[in-house]
Regions:
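Conserved donor-binding loops in enzymes that form glycosidic bonds
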Residues: 11, 32, 56, 80, ...
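Short, surface-exposed alpha-helical segments at coil->helix boundaries
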Residues: 38-41, 155, 190, 247, ...
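Residue-level signature of the cytosolic catalytic core of signaling kinases
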Residues: 59, 129, 142, 150, ...
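NAD(P)-dependent short-chain dehydrogenase/reductase
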Residues: 127-130, 134, 148, 152-212, ...
Length: 307
């Protein structure tokens, strides 16, 4: 299979590239390297053969021409949604990438587009709903904040292009993904590991009792790879269904790094857009992607710290 990965030099994208190459697919990476790094693709480049890397803006005419030349079976879009407090241009950029990819897919006859978006943005604030959150149909989504609206709009674009141009899609609502190659500023797990391994005090927003659904990157990539061939027309939760508090997460990471348990966490004010509790149920993923998470949190954190 011929696959294009938008954002393939990033944290999750580079792991997806490794997975696709290991299954003998041909992969073209399109990445502007604004947040990604060629170092993330060192293993993939060593494999050689089926990989080509293109330092391009995904919205450029050059990227469109490349997609037209390659005519991939699947395009994976792994772009980063900015925090809600970022300037409007940053949010517009995220939508421009999805729209540009869909337009290229329409023009060049691409069969399927897979987009991953943060579940925390897409599902809003589940204050009165039972956790873990069940899968919902796209029309039932009620996102909150600018980031959530952008995530929802990305999924709406997929639906529109499927209805108008018969371009198949699968949208994955991803839990909080962690693992090797994660940047220190790429989320709470990366920040805590950086603090622990550099003997610096971790910073916790609020009291640390807020919870997240933590998904190891290999598990996330397995779902992405499966979505390339399954789950057409669906929005699918990809998570563990298990809540872990931010405070407990720090304690688990600190226990893996000598001396880190002696570090005293610094508590800052709670963020205005902070979710109090969050976890998602992957029932639809089990049914339609034949996927379930398999990496225990302690095992995943150990691999991250030791790797």
């Amino acid at each position: 299979m011929n696959v294009v990965v938008i954002g393939g030099a990033g944290f999750i994208g580079s792991h997806l590239v490794d997975r696709l190459l290991s299954h003998d697919h041909t992969v073209d990476v399109i990445d502007d390297l604004s947040t990604g790094s060629l170092a993330n693709l060192a293993d993939a480049r060593a494999v050689g053969g089926g990989l080509k890397i293109h330092h391009l803006d995904a919205t450029s005419t050059e990227a469109d021409s490349l997609i037209g030349m390659r005519r991939p079976d699947v395009i994976h879009v792994l772009t980063t949604l900015p925090p809600s407090d970022q300037p409007p241009a940053a949010h517009a950029r995220a939508l421009q990438v999805v729209l540009a990819v869909l337009e290229a897919a329409r023009r060049h006859g691409v069969g399927k587009v897979v987009v991953a978006v943060p579940a925390t943005a897409l599902h809003g604030h589940p204050t009165s709903r039972a956790l873990p959150l069940k899968d919902v149909d796209i029309g039932q989504l009620v996102p909150r904040g600018v980031r959530g609206v952008v995530a929802r709009a990305s999924v709406d674009l997929l639906v529109a292009f499927r209805d108008l141009h018969a371009i198949e899609f699968t949208a994955l609502a991803m839990a909080t993904v962690y693992g090797p190659r994660q940047r220190a500023d790429g989320g709470v797990v990366g920040a805590f590991v950086h603090a622990a391994t550099n003997a610096s005090a971790p910073v916790i927003d609020g009291d640390g009792r807020q919870t997240r659904d933590l998904l190891y990157v290999d598990d996330a990539v397995d779902a992405l790879a499966r979505a390339g061939e399954r789950g057409g027309g669906l929005l699918v939760n990809v998570g563990t269904g298990v809540q872990t508090s931010v405070g407990e997460l720090w304690n688990r990471i600190a226990a893996l790094v000598p001396g880190a348990s002696d570090l005293l966490a610094l508590h800052g004010p709670a963020r205005s857009d902070e979710l109090a509790r969050f976890a998602i149920s992957p029932v639809r993923a089990r049914i339609h992607l034949a996927w379930s998470p398999w990496t225990d949190l302690d095992d995943g954190l150990t691999r991250l710290v030791e790797g």
